[in-house]
Amino acid sequence: VPERPLLNKFAWMVGAFAVAGASIPTLGLSSSVSEAGINAQRLHEPPYNLIGRKIAIGAVDIGRPRKFGWDKSVQNHREIPVQGVFFQDTLPKPNAVEELPETMAQEHAEQVAAVMVSSDKTSRGVAPGAKLYAAGVGRLERNGQPEECVAAQHLAGQNGGDLRAINLSFGESLEQDPRPNARLDGNALLTQCLDWSARVHDVLYVVAGNQGSGGIPIPTDNYNGVNVAFSTLYEGMFRKVDLANVGTDFSGVLTRLVGKESNVNNRRLVSIVAPGSNLELLTLDGQRTVTSGTSFAAPHVTATVALLQEYGDRQLSQKTPQWTLDARRHQVMKAVLLNSADKIKDQGDGLRLGMGRDLLGAGNRNWLDSDAYKSPEIPLDGEMGSGHLDAFRAYQQFSAGQWSPAQAVPALGWDYREVSDKSYQDYVLEAPLQSGSFVAVTLTWNRLVELNDSNGNKQYDLGESFADRGLNDLNLYLMPAEENNTSKSISASTSQVDSTEHIFFPVPKTGRYKIRVQYAKSAFEGTQPYALAWWTVPSR
């Protein structure tokens, strides 16, 4: 393959390698995994004992982490255990060469891996028991999206085809996209590939959000994955969206960036926020480097999936009531992660769902200041998404189990189901809700992307393409239990362009309520699978 300097792709990484100045505190991985970060350490300890055992996750990057037993240069360092490494879809050459671009890519990939699976006692990763498969795509003279798709597909087939989440901590340039007048409209080849693979391989793709001066935003225009912005430490917690993130909203002279740095049609770009500023991370040389960026926020989310999936598999093996194989679905993971994210700190009375932090955006505004809180047509905040990742709250959300709308449902839970065109599913909450308490509800579903499979082998091959079949329009309502008219709902999320709907709203008065999932408009098929997660407060 012809090679070239990785100017565009390494712009993403070089920005992520900013070394903190003396006046800025640097933080070991233990801080971002602790209560000040995503609160995953609590899940590592009794009685939870969740470290991602037997759960396979993946990482696609420009480089790959070195693997003990494959690369001689890491014989003395085993703190970042990698289950399998690949170059695109083949075994890599052992003992990666030490030219500068390869070294940078290797270090970046190892630091991303460290966030997920590091076993170092002072810098333990989010899911040190998980099985990580990693693929590097290498240096390409042109747009590398086809090879990146091949690598992602190959990872999705590892572990017997059972990978629960795949991390992407790099971006592709719109300028190198071969489409004429390419824009962030969801139809770049890599973006379509991820949305196709999410459905076909049932894997959650976690994508590092756009940052810095932008310029490498593909595949943040995906529909079926999760895009991650990064937070910085503020008053002792990771609770402020870093100014280096590129969000969704552009106004004034910056409207020229719509479609280039943010999605067309005001579709939300950021799903969730995770720690990523001034982290001290490990490489397999035993070196610790201070890094910042969405590259290191995204793997916090990917590895949290491994913790949740270990719990889910434990429940399935014990045949626990309210647990089915739906617990493994990527849509369920997306709904659970987004619905349990921190927005505004609870005052100790539980009315704000036990949230542990006030997340702040530009100008110190919080989620209640956002257009997403005020407008039913905007499900997520442009900077903050649904809020800040909290692994323990995600566990609480997930551990409540799956509940069918066939009978009244508890205050906390999730479901995976289908809804027919022009129909709806009503989830009636069994207990009255407390006046003044917040309700959080998240609905997720997939855009349909199909493979133009010229040779009929059901796999993407170089030279093939994808077809966008569109996005069915689902809406979400919180309504009085006896009401049937959605115009009388107390809160709604009715975006016409997003594949996520989200409600976060205070209950106006104590009473019985229900959640409605409504199929508003069909783009392709008669039924639409979806995942739903809800968190409410029963009356006292």
Identify the residue ranges that each predicted region occupies.
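Hydrolase catalytic cores
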Residues: 137, 273-367
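Bacterial N-terminal signal peptides that target proteins for export
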Residues: 2-14
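Secreted peptidase-domain scaffold signal
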Residues: 354-472, 531-540
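C-terminal edge strands of extracellular/lumenal beta-sandwich accessory domains
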Residues: 329-330, 334, 339, 425-429, ...
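Substrate-binding/access-modulating region of protease and related hydrolase catalytic domains
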Residues: 119, 137-225, 230, 235, ...
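Subtilisin-like serine protease catalytic core
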Residues: 31-33, 42-147, 160-165, 175-177, ...
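Extracellular S/T/G-rich loop segment that most often corresponds to the catalytic His/Ser-adjacent loop
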Residues: 61, 218-310
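Bacterial N-terminal signal peptides
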Residues: 13-23
